[in-house]
From Swiss-Prot:
Pathway: Cofactor biosynthesis; thiamine diphosphate biosynthesis; thiamine phosphate from 4-amino-2-methyl-5-diphosphomethylpyrimidine and 4-methyl-5-(2-phosphoethyl)-thiazole: step 1/1; Cofactor biosynthesis; thiamine diphosphate biosynthesis; 4-amino-2-methyl-5-diphosphomethylpyrimidine from 5-amino-1-(5-phospho-D-ribosyl)imidazole: step 2/3
A Gene Ontology BP annotation from the UniProt entry: thiamine biosynthetic process
Lineage: Eukaryota, Viridiplantae, Streptophyta, Embryophyta, Tracheophyta
Protein name stated in the entry: Thiamine biosynthetic bifunctional enzyme TH1, chloroplastic
UniProt organism field: Arabidopsis thaliana (Mouse-ear cress)
Binding site for Mg(2+): D378, D397
Length: 522
């Protein structure tokens, strides 16, 4: 083993010679992430958080340490930078051996260290680079000097696929630009995008006077505001590292950028929610549990990729309607999502299993590319086979508790409920949301008893879960449904109002507009 200052001479054919030791027939590809960051002795952030996140998301993670910190829940007491020569040795060691899908950077506390990283990334290209410009922690601790701002702007940001600054870091990168509102976050994201990264995510978790946690995502053309309720907890140490590492892990698994960002935000939200009452350390900012998804309590780990606001415009497909209008399920799905559908349920009553599976795989590709969840109606086997985001089951289908045991804690499970008793049972069994109805008469389901607006409100009041209304809902009555004064009513599910129409895109836009207007009127 070399000393810290020693540099090993690596043979040019190092990777190719070792790769020949494994036959192609025996290879099973494992998603791989490299994190280049500082060590946190308290283990809530930095390298330690990165390793835990990747393990929790099912991704292999290697590490290169740039600095060693002395810190705990009370703050950062000291920072020791490792010699750039030794950091280069670490980088060469892992980059010459592993085939990383994504490199994620955290604390890069000197220009020399950034230079070393840039040189090694030039020598060993990777598919994606996630840059978390760790300069100011959420708690306000300064972790990097101002001298590296120029090299970040001029050299690192232009090669990044995504950067994930908090508002303080975004302000520093923009020469002190003031960021105190969502509008200013949007302006900052646009200005940062002009520096070269393909995507920008400005994190607003510490935005002053905001009841929500709001992150602004910008792809160069469109803005996405990713909102979630602010969670009251002291255990927020390492949220930025966790978010960036989760994005890297999802990218390594093949997700689109928007989908990776959405999954990462929900992962952090649910980790914070699960950990809000734990006590580790005596300081003001504690760590949280990255492995909440492994806990046995079905209530403790639900919704790891589920945001109740995704129920807003819930599109349920119908193959017969698509055939009637001479369009494929893929075309129908694209139009619905582009028009504003926020979640998709694939319902197929006619196709054989193999045909249904191929259809589901095609739909998964469309949904993931747009960051929209896909649920399978009834068929647990299809959901497992295509790795859908979840399922929706009825009262006569497989019991929810058994579905949860088969799918695990990460998948979304919805269940149809007509009564308060059914709604209560859905919560106990581990469902994530309730589909309640039919609210009005409908032709899409035979002999379906309607419950009306009063019945819908009763279910909402009895439920601890978010609710989506379904049954006979369209542009003419969607507003009245959303105005029944039930805070946990998150949206409407539609079938014929979308898919039994000449233009799915136009109808989706109209429905989305109607729902937004009704929500503002509440």
């Amino acid at each position: 083993m070399n000393s810290l200052g020693g540099i090993r001479s690596w043979p040019a054919n190092w990777r190719s010679t070792t790769a020949s030791m494994t036959t192609t027939e025996s290879v099973r590809k494992v998603p791989q992430v490299l994190t280049v960051a500082g060590s946190d002795s308290g283990a809530g952030a930095g390298i330690q958080a990165d390793l835990k996140v990747c393990a929790a998301r099912g991704v292999y993670c290697a590490s290169v340490i740039t600095a060693v910190t002395a810190q705990n829940t009370r703050g950062v007491q000291s920072v020791h930078l490792l010699p750039p020569e030794f950091i280069s040795e670490q980088l060469k060691s892992v980059l010459s051996d592993f085939e990383f899908d994504v490199v994620k950077t955290g604390m890069l506390p000197s220009t020399e260290i950034v230079e070393v990283l840039l040189q090694n990334l030039s020598d060993f290209p990777v598919r994606a680079l996630v840059v978390d410009p760790v300069m100011v922690s959420t708690s306000g601790h300064v972790l990097a000097g101002s001298s590296i701002l120029s090299i970040f702007r001029e050299r690192l940001l232009p090669i990044a696929d995504i950067i994930t600054p908090n508002v303080k870091e975004a302000s520093a990168l923009l020469d002190g630009f003031r960021i105190e509102t969502v509008a200013e976050m949007r302006s900052a994201a646009k200005s940062l995008h002009e520096m070269g990264p393909r995507f920008v995510l400005v994190k607003g978790g510490d935005l002053p006077d905001s009841s929500d946690s709001v992150d602004v995502y910008f792809d160069g053309k469109e803005f996405h505001e990713l909102r979630s309720p602010r969670i009251a907890t002291r255990n927020t140490h390492g949220t930025g590292c966790t978010l960036a590492s989760c994005i890297a892990a999802e990218l390594a698994k093949g997700s689109s950028m928007l989908s990776a960002v959405k999954v990462a935000k929900r992962f952090v939200d649910n980790a914070l929610d699960y950990s809000k009452d734990i006590v580790i350390g005596s300081g003001m900012q504690g760590p949280f549990d990255h492995f909440f998804g492994l806990k046995k309590d079905p209530q403790s780990s639900r919704c790891s990729i589920f945001n109740p606001d995704d129920l807003f415009l819930y599109a349920v497909t119908d193959s017969r309607m698509n055939k009637k209008w001479n369009r494929s399920i893929v075309d129908a799905l694209k139009a619905a999502i582009e028009g504003g559908a926020t979640i998709i349920q694939l319902r197929e009553k006619e196709a054989e299993t193999r045909e249904f599976l191929e259809e589901a795989k095609a739909c998964i590709d469309i949904c993931r590319s747009h960051g929209v969840s896909l649920l399978i109606n009834d068929r647990i086997d299809i959901a497992l086979a295509c790795d859908a985001d979840g399922v929706h089951v009825g009262q006569s289908d497989m019991p929810v508790d058994l579905v949860r045991s088969l799918l695990g804690p990460d998948k979304i499970i919805g269940v149809s409920c007509k009564t308060p008793e059914q709604a209560h049972q859905a919560w106990k069994d581990g469902a994530d949301y309730i589909g309640s109805g039919g609210v009005f008469p409908t032709n899409t389901k035979a002999n379906n008893r309607t419950i009306g607006l009063d019945g819908l409100k009763e279910v909402c009041e009895a439920s601890k879960l978010p609710v989506v209304a379904i049954g006979g809902i369209g542009i003419s009555n969607a507003g009245s449904v959303m105005q029944i004064d039930a805070p946990n009513l998150k949206g409407v599910a539609v079938v014929s109002a979308l898919f039994d129409q000449d233009c799915v895109l136009t109808q989706a836009k109209k429905l989305h507009k109607t729902l937004k207007e009704s929500k503002r009127g509440i």
